[in-house]
């Protein structure tokens, strides 16, 4: 049986299996014209979601669940999405790690192929943080379940891969992580 016959959600990723050819047939003229006529709307929506990640969370918030963000948390998310680096001093219990990880999730959805790393003193700490926040986010925002291709967690390593080839993994704040490259840490 060829790879083309497999049409299972986790096995049909063209990026991970070069022998796979999409089972999707090309669009007819009518469907293509409809897609083309709405392309500007899709582009505007993605641009809006990239610029206002807090409002995107409000949009995908389920009827029961989700969180209500404060204005300073909204500002934190917007700055994290718009700039490569930022500096802030926040108190304990302000949900810094949660907001950082959920902003990574949103960026992974809207920037295909981006690579993030969550860092902590050790890889074990970073792995535990990412696992806890991953579970918390999926509980509060089940929409992200459809965007995640695979999530692997072990004692000293963690990786979340998205369907658009973006990923989040962990690094330690130590000399053992020197030379490892990511788009954003």
Give the residues covered by each predicted segment.
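Phosphate/NTP-binding elements of NTP-utilizing enzymes
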Residues: 1-185
